[in-house]
């Protein structure tokens, strides 16, 4: 029997936020509705942060970023969704996509309904699910025991992080848990370690689903050095250990990293190490190279 390929899988689930998750989803967009992204919703900076401070609700920025990268048919709707206001007025810096998602959130019973309305408008087949449909922020405790609230402040820390929490304690979106339960393959990364990847793993229902699933899990490492000093100073094996500490079980079966990463301390996991950089932006993954690396990981997993 031949080894499985990505095209053979019925359900692929990717976890993360920011540009990284969007890159993974766009590299696998040929899977269509068999692909699901579970998106971090703790951002409190930029346009997203301004909307949250004035209107409340979940953070829409990472969701918008994923939708932007999944648009394959340019249209008036997609141009509107990607538009960012300039100038010095009250709308300066706001992304229209964030405002559209927030408006649809007001008009919908659930944030997930707002996302599905936008997906249909933009002709995006990939399922996108917020990690939680409740407003939530990230909190860190630094090495001095100080509480640091919000992604923006956590990104500015210069000392090690001792603990991460979500505040308040919120439930995961039930469809996200179901997607993990049904998955044939789970992917996490790339992305900002503490502020894009870890928030999803802090949800107890997500952690429980990851402990229980028989699906293999692949971690994709960043290509560039993180701007956050606590994250930038972590070695690959430390990141894997921290993720699994919060999940409560050894769950990562394979890692995909660039050629410069030290993998000598990574034991009992499949390592796919090769050139992955996009030609235009070296710290971003090339979509085809990433797709090929995921195929190799799947083949090695058997």
Curated annotation (Swiss-Prot):
The record's listing under SUPFAM superfamilies reads: CofD-like
Subcellular location, principal: cytoplasm
Residues annotated as coiled-coil are none
Q: Name one GO biological process term.
A: regulation of cell shape
The UniProt entry's GO CC annotations, sorted and at most eight, read: cytoplasm
Localization, UniProt: Cytoplasm
Which InterPro entries does the record associate with it? CofD (IPR002882), CofD-like_dom_sf (IPR038136), Gluconeogen_factor (IPR010119)
GO MF annotations in UniProt: LPPG:FO 2-phospho-L-lactate transferase activity
Question: Extra info from the record?
Answer: Was shown to partially rescue a mgfK mutant in B.subtilis, suggesting that the function of this protein is conserved in different bacteria.
- What this chain does, per the record? Required for morphogenesis under gluconeogenic growth conditions.
Q: What is this protein called?
A: Putative gluconeogenesis factor
Q: Tell me what organism the protein belongs to.
A: Escherichia coli (strain K12)
Gene that this sequence comes from: ybhK
